């Protein structure tokens, strides 16, 4: 039951950390690809 109660906060933390990191990484790769071309 504790895991179920903590799930929203865990999801928020995960999304708050992983999504910006993924967005920045994809943006960085996109810029690098455009620089080469």
Swiss-Prot record:
Places the protein is found: Plastid, Chloroplast thylakoid membrane
Annotated source species: Pelargonium hortorum
NCBIfam families listed in its UniProt record: PS_I_psaI
Gene Ontology cellular-component annotations: chloroplast thylakoid membrane; photosystem I
Keyword Transmembrane: yes
Family from the record: Belongs to the PsaI family.
Function: May help in the organization of the PsaL subunit.
Transmembrane regions: 9-29
Protein's name according to its UniProt entry: Photosystem I reaction center subunit VIII
Gene Ontology biological process terms in this record: photosynthesis
UniProt keywords, alphabetically: Chloroplast, Membrane, Photosynthesis, Photosystem I, Plastid, Thylakoid, Transmembrane, Transmembrane helix
Membrane protein topology class: Single-pass membrane protein
């Amino acid at each position: 039951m504790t895991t179920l109660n903590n799930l929203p906060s865990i999801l928020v933390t995960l999304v708050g950390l992983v999504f910006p990191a993924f967005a920045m990484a994809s943006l960085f790769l996109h810029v690098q690809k455009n620089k080469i071309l």
